């Protein structure tokens, strides 16, 4: 018996391309696809009345900060540094409070905390949907319903002539037990 040696297929890649670049389809660049908005017909400029007061007020602000006492500037910088430290503490405290409430059963756990609660792991499985009763009544099967029309003969057969009243023919064709009308 001859021995067959199987080797995996090797694809040659150019030196400057990786396998990811080769396997991904080329997508159009979003910058190339977006057209530049049309230039406005007239350039928009601010009214000279509004521009002049802003230009006058802007140089005054740096002069006012330079006139402050260096101790006041240092205190202002410390206050700015302290505020970001307080902000992270609030969400941590809120998360801890929520966790305490969830473990005490006062609040519904959410997210990752919901999966870690004992109720989620120890709760019995809900009954299957097929076992639950429904309010809708069952519809009777089509074959069970009595019909007033005579049964159609099979293809190629002639219809049988029935003697008697039409009500009797319906009772004979019915699958239900006929009711004796004389007993009533």
From Swiss-Prot:
Comp. bias intervals (Low complexity): 25-36, 53-65, 120-156
Acidic residues: compositionally biased ranges: 72-92
Region (Disordered): 1-184
Compositional bias of kind Basic and acidic residues: 96-119, 159-168
Signal peptide limits: none
The family this protein is said to belong to: To H.brasiliensis latex allergen Hev b 5.
Protein name: Fruit protein pKIWI501
């Amino acid at each position: 018996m001859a021995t067959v040696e199987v080797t995996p297929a090797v694809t040659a890649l150019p030196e400057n391309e990786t396998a990811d670049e080769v396997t991904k389809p080329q997508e159009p660049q979003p910058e190339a696809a977006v057209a530049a908005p049309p230039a406005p017909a007239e350039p928009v400029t601010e009214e000279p009345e509004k521009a002049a007061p802003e230009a006058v007020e802007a140089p005054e602000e740096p002069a006012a900060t330079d006139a402050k006492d260096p101790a006041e500037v240092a205190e202002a910088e410390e206050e700015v540094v302290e505020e970001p430290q307080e902000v992270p503490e609030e969400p941590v405290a809120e998360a801890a409070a929520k966790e305490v409430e969830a473990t005490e059963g006062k609040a519904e756990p959410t997210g990752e905390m919901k999966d870690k609660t004992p109720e989620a792991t120890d709760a019995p499985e809900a009954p299957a949907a097929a076992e639950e009763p429904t309010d809708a009544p069952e519809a009777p099967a089509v074959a069970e319903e009595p019909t007033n029309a005579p049964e159609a003969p099979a293809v190629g057969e002639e219809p049988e002539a029935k003697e008697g009243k039409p009500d009797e023919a319906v009772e004979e064709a019915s699958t239900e037990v006929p009711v004796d009308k004389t007993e009533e």
